[in-house]
Curated annotation (Swiss-Prot):
Superkingdom field: Viruses
Record protein name field: Uncharacterized protein R132
Gene3D superfamilies: Vaccinia Virus protein VP39
InterPro entries found in the cross-reference section: SAM-dependent_MTases_sf (IPR029063)
Amino acid sequence: MDDESRLVAYQKAKYIKENMFGRTFHLHFHILENLANTFEKDDLTYVEIGTFEGGSLSLMMQNKKIKNLIGIDPLCIAGQEENLKKNTVKFNIHGSNVQHIKRYSYDEAIFPILDTLPNGIDILFIDGDHQYQPVINDFNLYYKYVNKGGYIVFDDYQDYRWSPQVMPAVNKIVADIQAGKYSPYKFEVIGCYPNNTGEVVSNIPVHGDMNNEFILKVVDK
């Protein structure tokens, strides 16, 4: 994943932001596009917890390798569901299978749906409740669905101004991984890539240095 490819992905995310219905909070999720492009297969499944109005989901719909997309969100903010539906229509340029699950991520009704996925999850984006325990809970509930070679990405790891509990939650998960708590599952801790886009989150200088998304890769299960 070189600097040039990340800049290309950033421009795609910027296009989404400038043309979508509603809004997205930052463009650091462009790294999801780069992760999708690391796969050799072209029938990927992407799942995100916390869809909001569909910025990151819209970016992933632009990638022809991703055939199945699932967004999980209670959609309880005024205008959110309408904008999400409009963005799905506008940006689903490859006719991908897109499913919106209008529930909280811990709702037991979700897991039978995931159990029926024929090929598991290739990329899981955790961008829901940014409090400490909910971040850990989302990981614990969903990591087993991610395929060997797949990625788990946490949003807002660097944003200690607006989401100060994400970093300690992810650090706890990493510590538990290193302690063998999740055995026989094994993860490569990739962490955050350097930010070469110039975009700053929350006007905090550190966000000019590092991408805001923290990445784990499933290497065995």
